[in-house]
């Protein structure tokens, strides 16, 4: 299932009900410098954001469910394990899964994500969406440059970029109902080529 994704079906082959359990699995393009024994051995890749926990939890659930697979089948129930790749990249591995048809016949999906705000042994539940979906936008500002000693002779795009970064979220917060759940976060910003 894609380059690293995996789908595992347990229980009934023609179920009356199919439940999917989803966990993200891929490493992130982050250099790990913790020095811990379990640190990534691959330079520039590590299991941050809980992905190692998510993959381990889903694998553990799969092992436990495999032990009762016959009982699930007798009850006409199936469980589909979705080891989802590329959660953090756009457009993301979920879209590949959906396009491949892995959601066909699935009645309910439970996803897992660790949350450091919860105490060990606690779980948090919510019906419906829990976190934001992401879209990626690229904004390019073009104009006449110049020297910092004469900003009045330039379009001063660095200043304009600062206004875009601060004003777009502010304007949207006044134009969109806050219950709609819209958030704008700029992940990377760059401006200019010279210090002056």
Locations of the language-model features?
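A non-catalytic alpha/beta surface segment that caps or lines the substrate-entry region
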Residues: 1-15
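Histidine/acidic-residue-rich, glycine-tolerant segments that coordinate divalent metal ions
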Residues: 5-7, 28-30, 35-46, 52-53, ...
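Active-site-proximal helix-loop elements at catalytic-domain edges
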Residues: 13-18, 115
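Residues that form or flank phosphate/diphosphate-binding pockets in enzymes
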Residues: 16, 56, 92
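Generic beta-sheet signal
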Residues: 18-19, 79
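Conserved beta-strand elements of the Class I
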Residues: 19-20, 110
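DPxDG-like acidic metal-binding loop motif
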Residues: 55-62
